[in-house]
Structure formats: C-alpha cells, structure tokens
C-alpha cells in the first residue's frame, strides 16, 4: 500500500481483524470502533489484566452490516487498521470503494498476516512483532512496544528452558471444523502466519509436515475427513473455533463426538485425551501471551503446569502507560 500519512495519533480508529485491534489496544490506543465478528475476538483475556476494562457493547460488529461502506462513514474513524485487499476479496468492495473511504474518512493501514497461503497476497508479510512495531509508529508508542518485546522475549526464554527435548515433543495437528461436522480445514504450523505463532514457539512437530495436505487458504477450502485424520494419527489434536468455550463446553462440542465416532476414536490424540482448544484465529501480543501459556500447560503439563509465562500486572501497566 506504500506510504501512509496520518494527521496525528488516531483517536478514533477501527480494525476488522482482532489481531490489529489487540495490537492497538496493547499500545494504549484504546478500543476499536468495529470488529469483524465479536465471537472471534478474545476480549475475555483483558478481564484478567488488573484495572483494565474493555466494553464490547461499544464495538460495532461489522459483518452484521455486510461490512458495507456505509458503516465506515458512520464510524468516522481517523484510521482503518485493515488490509484493503481483504475488503476486495472477502466483501466485494472494488478499488473505488476503498479509495472513496480513504479520501472521505481516513487512511487504511494493515497487512493480512494471519496466514501465508493465499495466492492473492503477493506482497511482503510481517511477523507479529514487525507489524506491532509499525503500529507503534502510528501511535507514537515506542516505549510500550519495547516493553512488550521485553515481555515476549522473557516468555520465549522461559519456554526454551522448560521445553522437553525434540524427541519427546508430540506430533500435533491443527484443524478448524468444517460445516459438515465430520470434516476439518487443515492448518500447517510452517505456514508462517501469526495465527500459528504459539505452536512454532512451543516447538511442536507438525503432523502434516510429512503429508501432501495443504494449508487452508482463500479459494481452496479443501478438508480432511475422519478417515484421513486416522491415517495421519496425530498425538495431539488442536481444534479451532472454540476460543471462548469453557472446558466443559469444548468437551461436549468436540471431544465427546470424536470419542463416539468409530474412526475418530482410534486416533492417538483422542485415545490419549489430548484434544485441546486451539483458541482464536487472530491474535495480537496480548492474546498471544494467553494463547501461548494455555497451549504450553495443555501440551506439556509436566514442564509448564506451575508456570506463569507472562506478568499480567506488567501487561496492564503497559496498556495504561504506567510503567
């Protein structure tokens, strides 16, 4: 998208995906005006940060209005932290729509970095902290960015100290339930997108690495069925789309149906009760802290059961600027 100019630090802004909403919130930018879908935004993690409040009722769910251009005029944001290619590929905007909103309302600033598998994305990708650094420039929040980097590096250091040797790490398969209920969209850890960051950081062996099963992407929603799942036979199964579920809700919705299925019940992960919620698709730095800690305790309970991988109070201080 080239250079983007801002008249000042945005006071009113919107994201579409929770990754950018979480980045801006972490940098002291406040709440997003809108979000793609409330159910996919893990705002419950903010409840664990002392003194931090997030009012979901003040956030417009953009998909309810079909992500129509009129919503952007109503929000009247100073900045839109959205990759405009998402609007043209997912929501039938054309370039004139993008240009009109940019001119009439405010600039677009974003890059779709959830995954790296879409053919239309033929420009540079950023990892989570590269994108966060650019967002910190927008909000003039270098001090907050540096503090988040320190926390992140401390977490990774703790992980490295506690991880079991490579040959003691399980093979894992990451999936998203398809509409049929008996099929899944596959996701590969080596895709490089920020949505799979925690699995790479935790050194998991991708069960798909030795197969020809591809990574989910726009325009190719190939699935794996339960028989294929049994053939791959992962030791750990990570299931998305249940980020906000309680443990009992997840077991009722996912684990029990797998146990009751003749094919799925033979999968090693199902037999070993190693089927876990994979959290949300999108994550900024705060959500990633929680995702990583939960994944570590789920997958490596002996190594991480007593571990607190990040300081909640420190995160709250960074958000408020009181550090």
Set out the residue ranges of the language-model regions.
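Solvent-exposed loop/turn segments at secondary-structure junctions
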Residues: 18-22, 38-41, 85-90, 114-118, ...
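Short, structured coil segments at secondary-structure junctions
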Residues: 28, 101-105, 202-203, 271
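Acidic/histidine-enriched, beta-strand-rich ligand/metal-binding domains
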Residues: 54-59, 215-224, 228, 241-309, ...
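Alpha-helical, coiled-coil/dimerization segments enriched in small aliphatic residues
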Residues: 185-220
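Short, low-complexity disordered leader/linker segments with a strong preference
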Residues: 1-6
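A short, structured surface patch at a secondary-structure boundary
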Residues: 12-93, 99-100, 210, 247
